[in-house]
Curated annotation (Swiss-Prot):
The gene is rpsT. It comes from Borrelia turicatae (strain 91E135). GO terms for biological process: translation. PANTHER family: 30S RIBOSOMAL PROTEIN S20, SMALL RIBOSOMAL SUBUNIT PROTEIN BS20C. One of its GO terms (cellular component) is cytosol. The keyword Ribonucleoprotein applies. Binds directly to 16S ribosomal RNA. This is Small ribosomal subunit protein bS20.
Length: 85
């Protein structure tokens, strides 16, 4: 870590952003698991509604560059394939 003021500020910013990103990624994992569980239980109607919510969250995270846009697309694709089975 640097000693000049700008380097110290960047370190503080990186710490804050890292905490926020970890929180969002954790939330994404949780809602993806909930969607998977709804699909496995055969609750298609609920799963479809929840899939829309998950899709929106993934797109938002990709737009804010918390996850890569291709990763968001891949996760949405995999969930939709499972949902349509």
């Amino acid at each position: 870590m640097g000693n000049n003021p700008s380097a110290l500020k960047r370190a503080r910013q990186n710490l804050k952003r890292n905490l926020r990103n970890v929180s969002v990624k954790s939330e994404l994992k949780t809602i993806e698991k909930r969607c998977m569980n709804l699909i496995r239980e055969g609750k298609k109607e609920e799963a479809l509604e929840f899939f829309k919510f998950v899709s929106k969250k993934l797109d938002t995270a990709a737009r804010k560059r918390i996850i890569h846009r291709n990763k968001a697309a891949r996760k949405k694709s995999n969930l939709s394939i499972l949902l349509l089975r």
